[in-house]
Amino acid sequence: MPRKEKPIHTMEMRRQLDTARIYRQTVSLRFWKLSTGDIVELSGWIVKNGHWRGGTHTFLNPANGEMRKVRDITIFEYMNHEIYL
């Protein structure tokens, strides 16, 4: 299991996601799926866009073109950083 980095605030995660979107960098994150409570891991995905007011980000899998919209509040780990509110 990779080493955990220091925790970061939700707003810092959103800023980093927006920076990753601008430079088309890949990201890894873990979030809870609201309908079932399952933990979903996205590794090596590209940030397609973000909606600050809506509190969501859309991610693109470069391998197969799958897109997934994630609510920011459900993300609990971003790039090995735990997220706090």
Task: List the predicted regions and their residue ranges.
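Structured surface patches comprising rigid loops and adjacent beta-strands/short helices at the edges
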Residues: V47-G50, K69-Y84
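Acidic, low-complexity, intrinsically disordered interaction modules
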Residues: D38-R53
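A short, Trp-centered hydrophobic/proline-enriched beta-strand micro-motif
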Residues: I22-K33
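Short coil-to-beta-strand transition motifs
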Residues: S35-L42, R68-R71
